[in-house]
Amino acid sequence: MEVKIFNTQDVQDFLRVASGLEQEGGNPRVKQIIHRVLSDLYKAIEDLNITSDEYWAGVAYLNQLGANQEAGLLSPGLGFDHYLDMRMDAEDAALGIENATPRTIEGPLYVAGAPESVGYARMDDGSDPNGHTLILHGTIFDADGKPLPNAKVEIWHANTKGFYSHFDPTGEQQAFNMRRSIITDENGQYRVRTILPAGYGCPPEGPTQQLLNQLGRHGNRPAHIHYFVSADGHRKLTTQINVAGDPYTYDDFAYATREGLVVDAVEHTDPEAIKANDVEGPFAEMVFDLKLTRLVDGVDNQVVDRPRLAV
Ligand code: MBD
Ligand code: FE
C-alpha cells in the first residue's frame, strides 16, 4: 500500500523539530543543512516507497562504511568529489578565471608530512620488484606565465600493485614511500625519479565495491599521479595526471580524468639517455608543466580544508 504523509503539517513540523530548528542552541548552518537533507530523504522514502528493510540495510551499510574507513572512497565513486570540482570550475568561469592546468579531485589517500627537497627527489625506496623507473619532471608557471622558483610541488602515487604507502594492506611499504614535496629550483622546475604506478582498485570485499556491484559498476582507477602545487601569491592547485594508454583512462570510477591531464610515458632505451638521467636501465619519462592562478582579492577563494592524515 502507498500512503502520502510527507506534505502534512505533522511531518513538516516534525522535520523542523528533528533538525533543532525549534531550539535556541546549536549551529544554524548545521541545522539548515540537516533540515534540507532530512527533508529530501524523508521525501525519497515516500516517493520511492522505501521499505523498512531497505532503510535498515542502508543504516547497516553506513556503519560498515565507517568501520572500513571507506566514506572518503565512496565519495568520489558516487561523483561527489568531481561534482565539487565542477562547481569550482563554474565559479571560476563566472569570475573570468582560466585554469590553464585543470583541477581534479584530491582523493582520500594524501598524507601530510612527506620529505621535502629542492629541485629533485627520489620518491621510491627501490623495493618494488616490478617497479619500472619513471623520470617525471616539468616547470611550474606563475599566473603571468613565468617559471616560478620556490613553489611547493607535492606528489603522491601508488606502487605497482596500486597500493599507497600508509594505506597498503600488505604492510610492505615504508612510511612516505612515493610521497615527496619538491621545491622548484631557480628555473621553476621540479624533477623526480620514481616508478610507474599501477591503477587503483577498490578493496574487492569492501562496502564501496559492494555498492558499486549493485550499480553494475567497476571500482577501478587508471594509473595516476597526484599533485598539490602551492606558491606565494597563488591559489593552491589540486590535480592529477593519468598515464596515457591505461584501459581505465576514460573509464575512471572516481571521474578524475580530464582533458589536459593525460600524459604519455615515453620509453627510453638508448644508453645516452640512460646515462644522462643517471638511471640503471631503460626508463619511462613523463613531462608535465603546471600553471597556477593568482589569489582572488588576496585570498585563495577555493582552498579545500578537509581532515587529512598527518604523520
Ligand atoms: C585513489 O588513489 C584515488 O586517487 C581516488 C580518488 C580514490 C581511490 C583511490
Ligand atoms: Fe590516487
From Swiss-Prot:
Its quaternary organisation is: Homodimer.
- Tell me which species this is from: Acinetobacter baylyi (strain ATCC 33305 / BD413 / ADP1)
Q: Where does catechol bind?
A: Y164, H224, I225, H226
List the gene name: catA
Which UniProt keywords are present, listed alphabetically?
Aromatic hydrocarbons catabolism, Dioxygenase, Iron, Metal-binding, Oxidoreductase
The record's remark on the cofactor is: Binds 1 Fe(3+) ion per subunit.
Q: What is this protein called?
A: Catechol 1,2-dioxygenase
The residues that hold Fe cation are Y164, Y200, H224, H226
Pfam families tied to this protein:
Dioxygenase_C, Dioxygenase_N
| Catalysed transformations (reactions) | catechol + O2 = cis,cis-muconate + 2 H(+)
